[in-house]
Curated annotation (Swiss-Prot):
Belongs to the bacterial ribosomal protein bL21 family. This is Large ribosomal subunit protein bL21. The keyword RNA-binding applies. It comes from Mycoplasma mycoides subsp. mycoides SC (strain CCUG 32753 / NCTC 10114 / PG1). It comes from the Bacteria. InterPro entries: bL21-like (IPR028909), bL21-like_sf (IPR036164), Ribosomal_bL21 (IPR001787), Ribosomal_bL21_CS (IPR018258). Keywords: Ribonucleoprotein, Ribosomal protein, RNA-binding, rRNA-binding.
Length: 100
């Protein structure tokens, strides 16, 4: 059984037992979370979501992604600026997919 959920402005296909990386959400490690915006379950498409459907998961890890470097450069102006950014994420294990 699979489902497509919407979280963090993205649509993600999930299956039971799968571990996914999503945009950071509030919560501690081992907290249970429920995703209510379910767009599809096993081919059944919602309009726009499926009422009463839920995907339950457990937070495994809160972390930051690999650092990226952004360089601002103006030729002939002697202006060079380097910025760094690490995007926070939440790793979630999908425990249950339920359609009502």
């Amino acid at each position: 059984m699979f489902a497509i959920i919407r979280t963090g402005g993205k649509q993600i296909k999930v299956e039971q037992g799968q571990e996914i990386f999503i945009e950071k959400i509030k919560g501690e490690v081992n907290d249970k979370i429920a995703f209510d915006e379910i767009l599809m379950i096993d081919g059944k498409i919602g309009t726009p979501t499926i009422k009463g459907a839920k995907v339950l998961g457990t937070i495994i890890k809160q972390g930051k992604a690999k650092k990226i470097r952004v360089i601002r450069y103006h030729p002939k102006k002697n202006v060079n600026k380097i910025y760094g950014h690490r995007q926070p994420y939440t790793k979630v294990k999908i425990d249950e997919i339920s359609a009502k």
